[in-house]
Amino acid sequence: MLVIGGLASAQSPRRGGSLRVGLSEDPPNMDPHQSVAAVDRQGFQNLYDKLVDINQDLEIVPMLATSWTISNGGRTYTFKLRPNIVFHDGTPFNAEAVRYNFERMLDRTFASPRRSEVLLVERLTIVDPLTIQIDLEKPFSPFLAVLSDRAGMMVSPAVARRLGRDFSREPVGTGPYKFVEKRPQERVVLERFDRHWDRTAGNVDRITYRTIIDEQALLANLKAGELDMINVAPPTDVPALKRDTSLKLLEREGLGYQGIWINTTGPPFNNKALRQAFNATIDRRTLVRVVFGETASPANGPFPTGLLGSDAGPNGRIPERNLDLARAKLREGGQPSGFAFTLKITPGRVQQQIAQVLQSMAVDVGIRINIEIVEFGTVLSQLNQARYEAVRLGWSGRPDPDGNLYAMAVTGGGLNYSGYSNARVDTLLDAARILTISDHRKRAYGEIITILNDDLPIIYLYWGKEYKVASLKLAGFVHIADGMMRFRHVWLNP
């Protein structure tokens, strides 16, 4: 049956039991300051606390910080921290720990993907043990939104200093669940942390995340009673799941996007005309209809419907398939008969379907796509090393548009795997971070998207809805549009 918003229950929460969660990808990294994979964040929601969080309405709400003030024209943030909090290793959480976490993310030698998210932090001042003042170089509108995700997740300074870049092997936060084990391609196990500050959190004793790459196999395991919740719904099964009274289908409009990352630094796609030729072969509406049906919509940029800037860009229009344009761009790019490239995809039936549809479209003008299936963690490593031509990936989305764009498009950004650089885009991205009036930010993002749809470091394909499927036993789950599974207050009914 279809459920919008979450799994409310008139019953009181129950303690005990083990929650079994199915993931369609294997989490490659348990360090929030090194992680780049959306699937990592599923476990992070329960292993780490953040300075702030978001609620169902995407409003910023307190977590480790109980309150904050913004002063000095938007350049100074002063956070009051929750008292009597300890990390899972027993060391205290305080203002000194917050300062260490920011310094860790900002350390050039540590090379954190979070660095571009907190780059405007100029000074960290400990006012008292439970108060920290953060001064920015200039106003930064998305700062609180940034701190509601990985940049706001606090790790144990003692363990991080001891393990360095190996922190992922023994991750320690302050969340309601602590790390037990990680077996690659198999499972991640967390268990309740009895010293957590929120005494209403941690109803279930243990959370086991099982990696099951095939979405149909995920659903089959849920139906068989081997899982209590899965992080995706196979698109073709959504209509039937809406009618199925033995399971709960949770649906929200998503915040993210799906596309193709293009390596603009090497052949063939260091040739802009060839990027444009390939893009012109894509019929996004047909792709969505064939693979996703009602569960997705064609995209023209990184901002799905409802996010600031979603109707910006090329007049809000979806790019159309244009084979005459594709052939003209092939001639301009010096490849009138077409060319070949390798599209890397992660395992899974849906990913193969997407690649095959793209392959069948591109060949109409002589563009030949070789499809290579690569394990998720490996493809992230190859992205980081620019060892690819094109990769089919997505971004799970953030509540502020800056989080969907800046790190991927700014020169030298922590997630700029395309090697893209455009001085005008850099200027506009920085300006949009400072602007506080929505219409002004929207105009800046509109120009950025227009440029990106011409330069094509990322080819935006579609925006997907956020689906989760759960057993009838699961209660207390709140479904937020960022797609993250927050289990701190859920419980299992008999």
Could you describe each region identified by the protein language model?
Residues 20, 94-101, 129-135, 175-176, ...:
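Alpha-helical secondary-structure segments
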Residues 22-72, 100-103, 172:
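N-terminal lobe/hinge region of extracytoplasmic solute-binding protein
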Residues 80, 114-158:
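Surface-exposed binding/hinge segments that line
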Residues 148-202, 206-208, 214-216, 323-324, ...:
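Gly/Pro-rich hinge or "lid" segments in bacterial periplasmic/extracellular proteins
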Residues 194-240, 359-360, 368-370:
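Ligand-site clamp/hinge motif
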Residues 297-332, 350-353:
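Structural transition elements
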Residues 319, 368-379, 384, 406-472, ...:
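Extracytoplasmic/peripheral linker and loop segments enriched in polar/acidic and small residues
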Residues 468-494:
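Long beta-strand-rich cores associated with HINT superfamily self-processing modules
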